[in-house]
Amino acid sequence: MTDTLTITRPDDWHLHVRDGAALEAVVPHSARQFGRALVMPNLRPPVTTAAQAVAYRDRIRAAVPPGTAFEPVMSLYLTDKLPPEEIALAAEAGVRALKLYPAGATTNSDAGVTDIRHTYKTLEAMQKHGLLLLVHGEVTDPAVDLFDREAVFIDRVMIPLRRDFPELKVVFEHLTTQEGAHYVRDANRFTAATITAHHLLYNRNAIFTGGIRPHYYCLPVLKRETHRVALVQAATSGSDRFFLGTDSAPHPAHLKEHALGCAGCYTALTAIELYAEAFDSVDALDKLEGFASFHGPDFYGLPRNSGTITLKRESWTVPETVPYGDATLKPLRGGETVHWKLM
């Protein structure tokens, strides 16, 4: 049994850090363990121009603790009306991707895409300039059951999108289903996916055990056990199609514990420890470095990190709350035990 594990410094390819005092509170949590993070653009208002992305990047960099090597990788928010001309400016500014949110699918997605066909000229420009498309893979059709939204998205959006843009690099974000895992596994080399720690560790029972547990509520929502098992199999398979993306999504505790609670699990505080626990549960720690440190930068066409981190098999208690501007934030598994610790 391995009691210590040293891996190349990992990256987080799906992270929410918000803005202002909230940003200042959470960025250090990610910076202590990751070399880079792909930052989501769903602010209010959303990040839709290269100039906005550069300004946001500067604010994130300013929140990184001195002496810590952490670089935000920026994305734009794709809308029906985002002009193709903005793509060249984005590429020049170092923006790496655009995020497709179906309108109304998740937090701050009101300005999202209503019909993927409205964005085709912009997608053509992205394919030309080498920017990636990151998709929140759910339909928002009210006739589709909440737990089926990902599978229906594959049929209605992903398959036509891949047919029309075969060489556009697409990341299926935060996979939650067996259908999604198999789709990415069997797709062409321009398709990959991120998987969260909470979708590897928990199924939908976690939301309801002993009462409503709002800190396990996220979108896409946790699914049944068969899907969790399929995600673990994908993540630990060694396939370079799958890589780490926490989708860590901070919300003040009082807005999670609310009649209309916000969707999102805050995992950035303990992210790499939670992933280690998930991989250890199926005796696959030897596959963690590829998933966490290699597959993401390889797909994005970026160099791998040169530093390392070390994890130790040690049980410790996650803080119940952490400061979050004028509020508090409850991390996933707050007050409970995690069985690996970042040294």
UniProtKB/Swiss-Prot annotation:
Its cofactor is Zn(2+). One of its GO terms (molecular function) is dihydroorotase activity. Pfam families: Amidohydro_1. One of its GO terms (biological process) is 'de novo' pyrimidine nucleobase biosynthetic process. One of its GO terms (cellular component) is cytosol. Keywords: Hydrolase, Metal-binding, Pyrimidine biosynthesis, Zinc. Binds 2 Zn(2+) ions per subunit. Zn(2+) 2 binds at residues 99, 136, 174. It catalyses: (S)-dihydroorotate + H2O = N-carbamoyl-L-aspartate + H(+). Pathway: Pyrimidine metabolism; UMP biosynthesis via de novo pathway; (S)-dihydroorotate from bicarbonate: step 3/3. Zn(2+) 1 binds at residues 14, 16, 99, 247. Its EC number is 3.5.2.3. It is an enzyme of class 3 (hydrolase). Catalyzes the reversible cyclization of carbamoyl aspartate to dihydroorotate. Homodimer. Belongs to the metallo-dependent hydrolases superfamily. DHOase family. Class II DHOase subfamily. PANTHER family: DIHYDROOROTASE. This is Dihydroorotase. It comes from Variovorax paradoxus (strain S110). The gene is pyrC.
